[in-house]
Amino acid sequence: MTRWIAWTAPAALVLSVGSAAHAVQYLTIPEAQRRAFPSATNFMVVQTDRIWRAEAGNRVIGFFIFDRVIGKHLYIDYSIALDPSGRIRQVDILQYRESYGGEIRSPSWLAQFIGKSNASPLQVGNDIRNISGATLSSHHVTEGIKRIMTIADRLK
C-alpha cells in the first residue's frame, strides 16, 4: 500500500497543477494600424499609447484604439479601427495570453463587429455570438468594445 502511495502521490500532484498560460503576440500596434488603415500617411496621437487619429494627407480617415480586457485569468490586448463616423471597420486581437480559448481570434467572430456603432446593442447572445470554450473572453472583449464605442463617440 505504501508503495502505491509513493508512486501515485507525485503523479497526482503533477497532474493537478493547471497548465501554464502562454502569451502569443499576433500583431504589434504599428502592424495593426497599417492593417486597419493601409492608406494612412500618419497616425497622430490623441491619447498616449491608446488612441490615434489615422490621416491620409490632411484628411482624417478614422481612429485606431488599443485596449486590454481580462479573459478568464489573463489579459487580452485588442484594437478597434473606426471610420470617421464612429462605425467599426476592423477589430484585431493583438495578444492572447490564455492557454485555451484562442478561437477569440476567429475572423468570422471578429467580423460580427464590423459596421457596428455605439447605437448597436453589442451583446453576446443578441447580435454577437458566444464562443464555446472562450465564454468569458468573448463576453469581456464584447464588453470592452462597447465601452470603447461609448468613449469613441467623443472623438467625432
Predicted regions and their residues:
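Bacterial N-terminal signal peptides that target proteins for export
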Residues: 1-8
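Flexible, solvent-exposed loop/hinge segments and secondary-structure transition points
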Residues: 19-129, 135-139, 143-156
